[in-house]
Structures are given as C-alpha cells and as structure tokens.
C-alpha cells in the first residue's frame, strides 16, 4: 500500500532500492552548481541510472550523457523514483503525467512540499517523500 514516507526506515529502504531515477526539472551542465544538476550528477556517480526530464531548455537533447525526455510518461521501462525539482505550486501540472507512468515512488526535494499533489500520488498507489534532499538521504542510508 502506497504511503507518505516520513520515517527513517522507509527512507532507507527506498534509497537502497534505487536503480533508475527520472529527474523532473533537471538543470543542464551550465547550472552545475545548482542542486537540480548536482544531485542527479551524484546519483549517476554512485551507479543509479538517471533519466533527465528538463522543464526548460528545449534545445537540449542530452544531460549527464543521457537522452532527455519531455514528459515522465514518455520514458520507456520502469522507474524506481521520480525526483522532483519544481516549485511546490508548479507540481500540480505534472501529477497526471507522473501517475500515467506509475513509478514506485516520487521524491519532492528539500524545501518542496505539496500536500495535495502528494495525496493524489499516494491515492494512485505511489509512495511519496516530501521536503528532503535525495543526495543527503542517499549518502546517509545507502548500503556501503
């Protein structure tokens, strides 16, 4: 049963199962210093397949050496997680797209919380983490 994951055991189980992560709102190499680039770069470095889904940059065809997709639903294959780098008020426009793909979980990065979107995702059977940094939690809980 899907749930809002807030406990450390749930976070640990989630980050230890990550193999393929779509990053909604990923930045390009030109914004290397921003978390929306550095977090997915870290995830790729530790062996997680990163699927870039930029919201802007229509001319960009690759980020982190991977082909970009313009929607979550267009990504072939299964996703363990959609890592979201969008302002809280901008998440609602992506909920149906995320539900259509049905990843195992959705992660709203540190400072990002949208309870209504989280509720819809959980009701659709998708686990949700809000207001936490994936890089911090992964480096804290990932099996060494």
Q: Language-model segments: what does each one mean?
A:
Residues 2-83, 91-144:
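Structural/interface elements that position substrates and couple domains in central-metabolism enzymes
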């Amino acid at each position: 049963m899907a749930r809002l994951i807030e406990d450390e055991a749930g976070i640990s189980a989630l980050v230890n199962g990550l193999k393929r992560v779509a990053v909604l709102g990923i930045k390009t190499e030109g914004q290397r210093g921003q978390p929306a680039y550095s977090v997915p770069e870290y995830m790729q470095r530790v062996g997680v397949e990163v699927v870039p889904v930029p919201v802007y940059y229509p001319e960009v065809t690759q980020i982190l050496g991977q082909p970009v997709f313009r929607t979550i639903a267009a990504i072939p294959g299964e996703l363990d997680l959609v890592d979201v780098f969008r302002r809280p008020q901008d998440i609602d426009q992506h909920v149906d797209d995320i539900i259509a793909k049905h990843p195992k979980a959705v992660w709203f990065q540190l400072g990002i919380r949208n309870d209504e979107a989280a509720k819809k995702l959980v009701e659709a059977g998708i686990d949700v983490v809000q207001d936490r940094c994936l890089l911090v939690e992964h480096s804290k809980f990932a099996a060494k």
